């Protein structure tokens, strides 16, 4: 098992998760004692304890005072955040996970957007306009740096859009533009979900954020994807302004079909880092 990690805690977490996935510590089994496991992994017991607590919160393990730590049937106990981890573990199934994400978004968006446009019309319009204006400025800018210097949301963008230490300047620009466009795409769906008045829809997007960023940062590297998304945002705005909420299912379904066509071409040449863990 070859594990790359940036810290002892990251290494321990990956070791345990990959051991669960590969059957070394299968679901239903008991983990080795803390002392034995810390020596096996090569980390301190303090570090291991922190990792075990985190994995328990994420649904991988059950920790009970005075009893051995048990490995869970993680597909029954984990939340949406596990999907990004599964992308790194089950590489052969990665594209299916992406397609499940896109299908789920297409299926639930008409529901929460209908409510958002009804009960929170003004805020919904403001959100969509902000995303349209920012994305139009992004694609029209001479460079990502030029866009950032003129954006009123520069601080927030820098908090959410991380550099990859890419040395080739042209590639760096492409990567940052794609990540920033995805930042706005996520903003649109997540905020409209919360504008619906039902927090559950917004929290679903919160749980999907890491996977959403992984997929969107690649998907929006294609100019056709950005062009299609902007067209969709403008149609959404018109629908919200007109109050014709009954048009949402057909509009969103059509966007899902057209974006899936782009994805089906892009997935034939996935970058090598598409399923790499960033921890």
UniProtKB/Swiss-Prot annotation:
One of its GO terms (molecular function) is DNA-binding transcription factor activity. Gene3D superfamilies: GntR ligand-binding domain-like (1.20.120.530), Winged helix-like DNA-binding domain superfamily/Winged helix DNA-binding domain (1.10.10.10). Multifunctional regulator of fatty acid metabolism. This is Fatty acid metabolism regulator protein. It comes from Vibrio vulnificus (strain YJ016). GO terms for cellular component: cytoplasm. It comes from the Bacteria. Residues 6-74 form the HTH gntR-type domain. Keywords: Activator, Cytoplasm, DNA-binding, Fatty acid metabolism, Lipid metabolism, Repressor, Transcription, Transcription regulation. It is found in: Cytoplasm. Residues 34-53 bind DNA. InterPro entries: FA-response_TF_FadR (IPR014178), FadR_C (IPR028374), TF_FadR/GntR_C (IPR008920), Tscrpt_reg_HTH_GntR (IPR000524), WH-like_DNA-bd_sf (IPR036388), WH_DNA-bd_sf (IPR036390). NCBIfam families: fadR_gamma, PRK04984.1. Homodimer. Pfam families: FadR_C, GntR. GO terms for biological process: fatty acid metabolic process; regulation of fatty acid metabolic process.
């Amino acid at each position: 098992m070859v594990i790359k990690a940036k810290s002892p805690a990251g290494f321990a977490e990956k070791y345990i998760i990959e051991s669960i996935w590969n059957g070394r510590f299968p679901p239903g089994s008991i983990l080795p004692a803390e002392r034995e496991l810390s020596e096996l992994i090569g980390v301190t017991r303090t570090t291991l304890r922190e990792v075990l607590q985190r994995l328990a919160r994420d649904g991988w393990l059950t920790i009970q005072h005075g009893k051995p730590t048990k490995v869970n049937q993680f597909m029954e106990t984990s939340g949406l955040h596990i999907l990004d981890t599964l992308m790194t573990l089950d590489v052969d199934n990665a594209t299916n996970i992406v397609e499940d994400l896109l299908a789920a978004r297409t299926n639930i968006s008409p529901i929460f957007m209908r409510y958002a446009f009804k009960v929170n019309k003004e805020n919904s319009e403001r959100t969509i306009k902000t995303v349209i204006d920012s994305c139009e400025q992004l694609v029209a800018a001479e460079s990502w740096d030029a866009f950032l210097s003129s954006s009123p949301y520069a601080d927030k963008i820098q908090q959410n859009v991380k550099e990859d230490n890419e040395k080739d300047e042209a590639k760096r620009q492409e990567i940052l533009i794609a990540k920033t466009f995805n930042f706005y795409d996520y903003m649109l769906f997540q905020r409209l979900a919360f504008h619906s008045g039902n927090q559950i829809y917004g929290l679903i997007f919160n749980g999907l954020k890491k996977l959403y960023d992984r997929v969107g940062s690649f998907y929006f590297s294609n100019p056709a994807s950005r062009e299609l998304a902007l067209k969709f945002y403008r149609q959404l705005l018109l629908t919200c302004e007109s109050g014709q909420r009954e048009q949402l299912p057909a509009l969103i379904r059509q966007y899902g079909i057209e974006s899936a066509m782009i994805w089906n071409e892009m997935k034939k040449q996935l970058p090598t880092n598409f399923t790499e863990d960033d921890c």
